[in-house]
């Protein structure tokens, strides 16, 4: 029995024929804020848990170099008895190389698949900052980016979808 390892396949060069897929070139925090206007009083134990209003936005734009910038904005506003407890907002960006995707399929890739890559990192930032702010970790449930995309698309076309 031998311990041999096969060499990993060579990565295709940019623009190589037949190349398909999404490649993350960079990811970064574009903007980040946390407010706890009534601390330390808002940190008191007991009372009703805060009501949390979540917001999700996705945007994408092409760049002259052929890459795409995708932004995922997550915001959470917590209130208790109509008083603000905390407000956190992160605008997390990614720079993507996308190859082999037909023009008609590009928008869903940019606004569904790319945010799926960015979400875990933006979610962790929010969890970490709420913990550092003295609150229990705020873990955002997984987001159905395809559902958000479909609802926004329908809304833009004037179709009523649920309570969107």
Curated annotation (Swiss-Prot):
<dbReference type="InterPro" id="IPR035958">
    <property type="entry name" value="SecB-like_sf"/>
</dbReference>
<comment type="function">
    <text>One of the proteins required for the normal export of preproteins out of the cell cytoplasm. It is a molecular chaperone that binds to a subset of precursor proteins, maintaining them in a translocation-competent state. It also specifically binds to its receptor SecA.</text>
</comment>
<keyword id="KW-0963">Cytoplasm</keyword>
<dbReference type="GO" id="GO:0006457">
    <property type="term" value="P:protein folding"/>
</dbReference>
<comment type="subunit">
    <text>Homotetramer, a dimer of dimers. One homotetramer interacts with 1 SecA dimer.</text>
</comment>
<dbReference type="Pfam" id="PF02556">
    <property type="entry name" value="SecB"/>
</dbReference>
<comment type="similarity">
    <text>Belongs to the SecB family.</text>
</comment>
<dbReference type="GO" id="GO:0051262">
    <property type="term" value="P:protein tetramerization"/>
</dbReference>
<dbReference type="InterPro" id="IPR003708">
    <property type="entry name" value="SecB"/>
</dbReference>
<keyword id="KW-0813">Transport</keyword>
<keyword id="KW-0143">Chaperone</keyword>
<keyword id="KW-0811">Translocation</keyword>
<keyword id="KW-0653">Protein transport</keyword>
<dbReference type="GO" id="GO:0005737">
    <property type="term" value="C:cytoplasm"/>
</dbReference>
<dbReference type="GO" id="GO:0015031">
    <property type="term" value="P:protein transport"/>
</dbReference>
<dbReference type="GO" id="GO:0051082">
    <property type="term" value="F:unfolded protein binding"/>
</dbReference>
<protein>
    <recommendedName>
        <fullName>Protein-export protein SecB</fullName>
    </recommendedName>
</protein>
